[in-house]
């Protein structure tokens, strides 16, 4: 999504980028069901600590995003649902890459 890319690009050039994690998740599978479950969706993680250029195929759910945010911020789970959610460890690395993000231009005429 062009708008999301531009937002991440701007934020990655800010002084806050070294301590930032951005999660982008669709609220539904947009075009509807296809040959796979319509309950699945995509989640994008942008951070100096995010693994760049990889597709993580680990099955997470929306509560996993919340659980990951709680762990990053060092706060306890709010309830049993986020306490039992799988944290998104596969999306991150211990070594930060502070290179700013560059949004791709639109290729739709």
Where are these regions (language model features)?
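N-terminal pro-sequences and low-complexity stem/linker regions of secreted or lumenal proteins
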Residues: 1-109
């Amino acid at each position: 999504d062009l708008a999301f890319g531009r937002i991440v690009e701007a934020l990655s050039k800010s002084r806050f980028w070294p301590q930032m994690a951005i999660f982008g998740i669709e609220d539904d599978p947009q075009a509807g069901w296809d040959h796979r479950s319509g309950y699945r969706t995509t989640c994008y993680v942008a951070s100096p600590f995010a693994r760049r250029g990889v597709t993580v195929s680990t099955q997470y759910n929306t509560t996993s995003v919340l659980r990951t945010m709680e762990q990053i911020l060092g706060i306890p789970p709010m309830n049993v649902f986020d306490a039992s959610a799988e944290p998104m460890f596969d999306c991150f690395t211990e070594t930060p890459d502070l290179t700013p993000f560059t949004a791709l231009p639109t290729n739709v005429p």
